Amino acid sequence: MRFDLEPPSSVAAAHRIGVLLINLGTPDAPTPRAVRRYLAEFLSDPRVVEIPQAVWQVLLRTLILPLRGRASAKKYAAVWMPEGSPLRVYTERQTDSVRHLLTSNGYHVMVDYAMRYGSPNISHALTQFKRAGVERVLLMPMYPQYSASTTATTFDAAFDALARMRNQPEVRTVRHYADHPAYIHALAEQVRQYWAQHGRPDFAAGDKLVLSFHGVPKRTLDLGDPYHDQCQQTGALLMAALGLSTTECRVTFQSRFGKAEWLQPYTAPTLREFGEAGVRRADVFCPGFTADCLETIEEIGMEVRDEFLAGGGTTFHRIPCLNGASAWIGALSEIVAENLQGWPVKAAQPEPVN
């Protein structure tokens, strides 16, 4: 292996600490070409699609990318913000807010973000940290619930980048925070604030709150992935915080891809069944997504909404993700701070003069 070129080591180096917030990724533009490039990287990850690569790559290159590239580009165009992709825009804002909050509390750390797929990538971010004199890095995936297809592959990419370094930094990882009290509080506050502005569902009349998490193939649960259980744990804690029963609130899973069985119940069919059963209002919230993106704005806000209304429902609400909510920025900063314990995160104070 050839290692990356590095400057000579120096005892006078900055010895800085870096916090890297890592999200899934996004195309650079809502165009078929950019979307195909992004999907090719994403769907080529063996952590994401556990099919023999020799077979999968033929299907991916000849069938899936040509068909999904153009269709997905139209969906991205429908949610694209003036500043860019929603996921990137919100992640940038979260990064700035966490940096500001930590700095205001006396933390002397660098805070940046990266994407597992697309740009800015993890390798580039770690290289920038190294050039700035960072010798300790906290990897903070923006996935509250652990899954091999999200959290583990994020760490894979980071360790691949570290493997090319001769002088590696000390590294810590945040595996999950599915049950962290500050995270649960931020979720509950997001729902409460939305209801304060738009009215609370009439649960006595049969209205429903649906907590929709991103789905994964069911076989991953059978193979030991803890994602399903952690989603259920988050859902139960959030229901308790909101004072709701399992009759009033349901955990579901969205974004199924392919014909294999995924975690159930599926979100869209559940909403249609609610409509057909006479449910008048349904609110959907996505606790596993810390920032709004295609899967929340388009899939939930448009496709799932249409399923509910087609089934006979009358009022649909998509509760925005945590995004830049103050409770979430506080929670995220708290989780980061807890995982920085033991490192010299605060600037050294001068010795008092006698």
Curated annotation (Swiss-Prot):
Record-linked InterPro entries: Ferrochelatase, Ferrochelatase_AS, Ferrochelatase_C, Ferrochelatase_N
GO MF term list: ferrochelatase activity; metal ion binding
GO biological process, one term: heme biosynthetic process
One GO location term (cellular component): cytoplasm
Reaction equation(s) it catalyzes: heme b + 2 H(+) = protoporphyrin IX + Fe(2+)
PROSITE patterns per UniProt: FERROCHELATASE
UniProt-annotated location(s): Cytoplasm
Residues that hold Fe cation according to the record: H214, E295
Listed EC numbers: 4.98.1.1
The keyword Signal is annotated on this UniProt entry: no
UniProt main location, coarse: cytoplasm
Pathway: Porphyrin-containing compound metabolism; protoheme biosynthesis; protoheme from protoporphyrin-IX: step 1/1
Matches recorded under PANTHER family: FERROCHELATASE, FERROCHELATASE, MITOCHONDRIAL
Family in the record: Belongs to the ferrochelatase family.
Role, per record: Catalyzes the ferrous insertion into protoporphyrin IX.
Name under which the protein is recorded: Ferrochelatase
Naturally occurring in which organism (per UniProt): Burkholderia cenocepacia (strain HI2424)
